[in-house]
Each structure stands twice: as structure tokens, then as C-alpha cells.
Amino acid sequence: MSNTQKQLALAKAAKKSVNTADAEEKNRALLAMADSLEAAAEDILAANRLDLKAAAGKIPDSMTDRLLLDGKRICAMADGIRAVAALPDPVGEILETSTLPNGLEIVKKRVAMGVIGIIYESRPNVTSDAAALALKSGSAVVLRSGKDAFQSARAIVAALKTGLAQTRIDPEAVQLIEDTGREGSYEMMRAKDYLDLLIPRGGAGLIRAVVENAVVPVIETGTGIVHIYIDKDADWDKALRIVYNAKTGRPSVCNSMEVLLVHEGIAADFLPKLERLLVRGRIEAGLPPVRFRLDPQAARYIGGEAAGADDFDTEFLDYILAVKTVASVEEAVGHIEARGTHHSDGIVTENRHAADYFTTHIDSAAVYINASTRFTDGGEFGLGCEMGISTQKLHARGPMGLKELTSYKYIVQGTGQVRE
């Protein structure tokens, strides 16, 4: 048995301590984890410095921001765990009840998933978020961090286990796979005897590898090639504010805008205003400017590189924005449906017909009217922290909170009935 299999077995053995715990016991465990995380801040920051040193010069600045931890972010991680503790416990919720003509009483009841596996890349906060959500939803969790964030993840898990050791929940219910190589991931993908669910969080390559190779049930958290369409009837003040936030708020995350579509009837006047905001305005403020990848029409109005063949299919996760002009809302929708990833897409318009057409025909997990796509987030949606953004339709779609990490079963109460 490999080390990875041993860790999977430990998680499976420990799941009973989680799925038999009541809400009060789980909440005590989460609060102890949060306190322990803050108490271990110096150890976690020291580990994070090792990750940052190893990554120096190898990843862009926007990706370094995803990897970076500081005291404020550790406090935010701890507060995220406390927020999960404050949420209602989904386990045991009665979803439906019915009584059949023969007197059988049927109850549909929400239950824990069992053991949840998470394969993720260079975001240390995923470690604590995933552990908190899994435990509150009644499941053990097996974490496999990317190499970039492994030292940080190891220190975070050590702190979480220290907190759990003070409660009745077995600390082995949280496992961090030590093998950060490809084999560690593939063992998890094949671990159908141990894992009830596997969730990948990361770039397109990671997600594709998991979806194509896993024999464990997978919830796909797709990449975010996020679009915003500025309609000819848009309020320009709203549009500029929304685009600025959606692109520059935190470009390294999956709900950040990557493609801007602008109605050709306003492009000549709107795009220069946008350029002043995203390029000159940010340079004057000492901030990184946005770099444009432009289709031929957009290139007539603002400066930037000519868009390459793949620029409208790329999740840049950087201060880069692909810009294209379109003749109508119908053309915008056609482009998004052909090139998007069904994550989050938005329209800015004061035209109700255009908004209704857009929301009806865009088949994405979150569709926005006159708002930044940066709101696609478990915390912003009132779910607490999230396990990821699902872009598939089966079981879960959009931000995955506690309810999305559970299943259900039927309890059938009889008085001796038999089927004739």
C-alpha cells in the first residue's frame, strides 16, 4: 500500500467521527480549527515564505498574489471557518415527505457525502476552506495541494489538526497528500474504494486531467473565460465601473473578466474612455496597466496587441483583456456560447429586451445584468466559503457551499407492507 493509499484509508476510517457528529460538535471543531489557525500564524507565514521563494521568477505577479499569505489573509481564513460554523447544518434536513396509498411513509433526508477529495493548485486558502466545508457537511476530506503551495498547505493542515485534537472529531479526517507529483493525483483519481467525490480546482490542464482520468465521481469546476458585453444601450458610468472591477479587482481568480465585447455602435467613443481608465489612469496611480488584445475593429480606436488565434479562448489570470466588437446582443451571445466556459458572463444595458435575451440564451452558471462578475463567490452568495465554482449541470452548479457537498437518502417507514 502506497503512502497515498494509507492516507486515503485513514480518512475513510475517520469519516465516522464526522458524519455521526451533531451540529454542535462540528461547530466546536470548526471554531477550534479557526483559533488554532490564528495561533499558528507565524509557522504558516514562515512556510509561505518558502513557497514564495521557490516560486520567485517562475510565475507572474498575479499568480504570486494567489500564493501570498500575510497576517490579514490568515485572519480572513480563520474568519471564513467561523462563518461556516455559523451556517445552518445541512445534514439531517428533511427535503420531502410523502405517504403512499398503501400507508408507506417516505422521507427524503439530506446526508453526508462520506469522503471528499480536492485536487487544487497554488491557493493556500483553499486548504482551510475545503476542510471547513467538508467537515461541516459531515465528510472527511483528502487534500492534494499543488507543489507551489505545498509548504503553506502543510502548515495550515498541521494547525487544523491541532484544533481538531481538542474535539471529538478525529484529526485524521483531514488529510494532506504528501506526494505532490503526478502519481499522487492519479492515485486519488483511481481511489473509488476510498473517495465518494473528487473536485479539481485549478487551471484547464488540471481540470481536464481529472475529468478524463478519474474513476471517482467528479464535480467539474471549469476555467473562467468570463465575458462582459457592453450593449449599445448601456449606462457608460456603470459599464466603466463594472469593467474596471471585473478585470482589475483580482485578475488571478476565476471570476475575473477575460473577454470584453462592445457593441460596434458605441465602440469608437466608449473604448478610448476605457483605455484612459485601465491604462493611463492605472499608470498614474502607480498600478499595473491592463494590456489589450484587440480584434481589428477595436484596434482602430485604442492601442494594444492584435488578438491572436487563441486570445479569445484563454484564461489569462493576469492584467490582460481580449476586446472584440459585435453588431448585436445576438452576436455577443453567439460568441460567448461558442468560446466561453459557462462560468460567469454578464451584460451591461438599460434595455430590458436585450437583458432578457442575454439571460435566456447564455447557458452559464451565473449570468449578470449590470453587475461585476466578481460576485460569483460562495461568500458573496451567502454560502460561506466555497469548495469551487461548478460549471457542470449534474448535482451542483455555480458556487458550491454546504448543501452542494451532501447527498440524500430515502427512509421508508412501514407497518408490515409487502409488494404484491
Curated annotation (Swiss-Prot):
Record key words, sorted: Amino-acid biosynthesis, Cytoplasm, NADP, Oxidoreductase, Proline biosynthesis
Main EC class the enzyme belongs to: oxidoreductase
Localization (cell): Cytoplasm
Any single Gene Ontology cellular-component annotation: cytoplasm
Taxonomy, superkingdom: Bacteria
EC numbers on record: 1.2.1.41
Record family assignment: Belongs to the gamma-glutamyl phosphate reductase family.
Physiological role: Catalyzes the NADPH-dependent reduction of L-glutamate 5-phosphate into L-glutamate 5-semialdehyde and phosphate. The product spontaneously undergoes cyclization to form 1-pyrroline-5-carboxylate.
Protein name: Gamma-glutamyl phosphate reductase
Origin organism lineage: Bacteria, Pseudomonadati, Pseudomonadota, Betaproteobacteria, Neisseriales
